[in-house]
Amino acid sequence: MWIVPASLVVVSAAEQKPEVQRLFQSGSYEQVVEAARDADPASTYLAAQALLKLNRMDGVAAEFARLKGNGPAWSLVGESGEALAANDAGRATDLARKATETDGDNPFAFYQLGLAASKAGDWGTASAAFSHAIALKADFAYAHYYGALAAQRQRQLPKAAEHFEAFLRLAPEAPERQAVQAIMRTLK
């Protein structure tokens, strides 16, 4: 029997429970938190994001802290999430960038980098990070959503429209649906 220290355990983002993402993309945030209990790190990350959307800051730090036993990249993603929740966009961006350098195949590391860079107003970095997250996990609607917002800030309206269309296709029950449809009418 082999004993592997927790700091060396690496869990792939591909091992995510698909129902957690589906619930997140439909705005069922309470159910996300329940479904992600004792789950994989990608689901735990989405639970933290759901708690942010619910403005339940007490649980956010706990969920991000749970990522720390899942390998170096997930630890950095968790630390970045904690920093972003504390409104430290610079530190959050640095930590997320390190996470992407540690595991270039983790779409949630790139998504976190996009969120942090957006908060810092670095739309070029945000757009590139969301595009990379989409390349790794094309079915993650919110990478398209925030990628569209970043593209819109850069006045790349065709790219924004493309991402918004993907978002609407992937998350037809999302709470942002009506707002996105209104934006789409102005882009056409």
Regions inferred by a protein language model and the residue ranges of each:
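Start-of-helix register in tetratricopeptide repeats
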Residues: A42, W74, F108, Y142, ...
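Conserved structural position within tetratricopeptide repeats
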Residues: E34, A65-G69, K98-E101, S131-A135, ...
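Alpha-helical segment of the N-proximal tetratricopeptide repeat
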Residues: Q16-A35, L46, W74-D88
